[in-house]
């Protein structure tokens, strides 16, 4: 069993919890995911099974989220899972004020990851240090790209909430956006809900709940996604049999393609052969997978 799954991660499980369950159900140790979701977050989690795990690093990095930001409340995790640091409410806050500050969160921005995150510092993950009560030195900011940030809805009240859709680069922390927006407004804010609606070609409307994947395996109907779809953002290069034979031996072959990487296929059989680095008129094998 090899290929990709478009998993709809439920709330309450870590991404690793989902992978562990799939390993038990599918009887396959080589299973990985294409982008961590926090335990409270839900939505698209791309999963690779078998040798497809070698292709995870080539998945499209674009992500789309639907997030709900709650104002007037701050926590140490920057979401509702953490301890409350400030609770003053923000009943006077209106959407007009919020929209003025949202512009600063579009385009290329700098953000500091949450204290509770998987970022490594001093050889350990930040969340491990935070849970042990270790004093964390200044966390280095990261540059991320916010391609689009759209207001979907506004809910006034003592703790007003803003629902937004964000298209962003990989490595973007939506919790940091919520926290920093609250800081800019002077009200404090935290992330109340997060749903990932897209990760590269994997869309929420085509995703499967974990229970459905488990039931499908029992029935022999697990809908695996092939590399043509999973790597659709990469150019496809088709090799004639003589060049395909050289490729399968790990040899560089002549060829042109756009971008840094390309899917490689054999012309006659339409077999997927792997992924190449595109280098000035030649294709350098990076991953050779002749029968995926």
Swiss-Prot record:
Pfam family, one: TruB-C_2
Signal peptide: none
UniProt keyword annotations, A-Z: Isomerase, tRNA processing
Catalytic activity: uridine(55) in tRNA = pseudouridine(55) in tRNA
InterPro entries: PsdUridine_synth_cat_dom_sf, PsdUridine_synth_N, tRNA_psdUridine_synth_TruB, tRNA_sdUridine_synth_fam1_C, TruB_C
The keyword Isomerase belongs to this UniProt entry's keyword annotation: yes
The UniProt record lists the keyword Isomerase: yes
List of catalytic residues: 38
GO biological process: mRNA pseudouridine synthesis; tRNA modification; tRNA pseudouridine synthesis
Enzyme Commission (EC) number: 5.4.99.25
Enzyme class: isomerase
NCBIfam families registered for this protein in UniProt: TruB
Known function: Responsible for synthesis of pseudouridine from uracil-55 in the psi GC loop of transfer RNAs.
PANTHER family in the record: PSEUDOURIDYLATE SYNTHASE TRUB1, TRNA-PSEUDOURIDINE SYNTHASE
Protein name: tRNA pseudouridine synthase B
Upper taxonomic lineage: Bacteria, Bacillati, Cyanobacteriota, Cyanophyceae, Gloeobacterales
């Amino acid at each position: 069993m090899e290929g990709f799954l478009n998993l709809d991660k439920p709330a309450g499980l870590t991404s690793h919890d989902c992978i562990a369950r799939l390993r038990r159900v599918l009887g396959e140790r080589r299973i990985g995911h294409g982008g961590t979701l926090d335990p409270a977050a839900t939505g698209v989690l791309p999963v690779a099974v078998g040798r497809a795990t070698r292709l995870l690093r080539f998945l499209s990095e674009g992500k789309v989220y639907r997030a709900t930001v709650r104002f007037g409340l701050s926590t140490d995790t920057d979401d509702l899972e953490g301890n409350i640091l400030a609770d003053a409410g923000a009943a006077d806050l209106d959407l007009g004020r919020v929209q003025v500050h949202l512009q600063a969160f579009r385009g290329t921005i700098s953000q500091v990851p949450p204290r509770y995150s998987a970022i490594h510092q001093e050889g350990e993950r930040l969340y491990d240090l935070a849970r042990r009560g270790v004093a964390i030195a200044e966390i280095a900011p990261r540059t991320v790209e916010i391609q689009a940030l759209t207001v979907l809805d506004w809910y006034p009240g003592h703790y007003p909430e803003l629902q937004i859709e964000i298209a962003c680069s990989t490595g973007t922390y939506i919790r940091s956006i919520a926290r920093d927006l609250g800081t800019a407004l002077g009200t404090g804010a935290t992330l109340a809900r997060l749903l990932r609606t897209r990760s590269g070609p994997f869309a929420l409307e085509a995703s499967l709940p974990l229970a459905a994947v488990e039931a499908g395996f029992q029935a022999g109907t697990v809908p695996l996604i092939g590399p043509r779809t999973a790597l659709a953002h990469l150019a496809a290069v088709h090799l004639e049999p003589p060049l395909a034979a050289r490729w399968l031996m790990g040899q560089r072959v002549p060829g042109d393609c756009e971008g840094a990487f390309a899917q490689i296929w054999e012309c006659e059989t339409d077999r997927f052969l792997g992924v190449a680095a595109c280098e000035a008129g030649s294709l350098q094998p990076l991953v050779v997978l002749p029968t995926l």
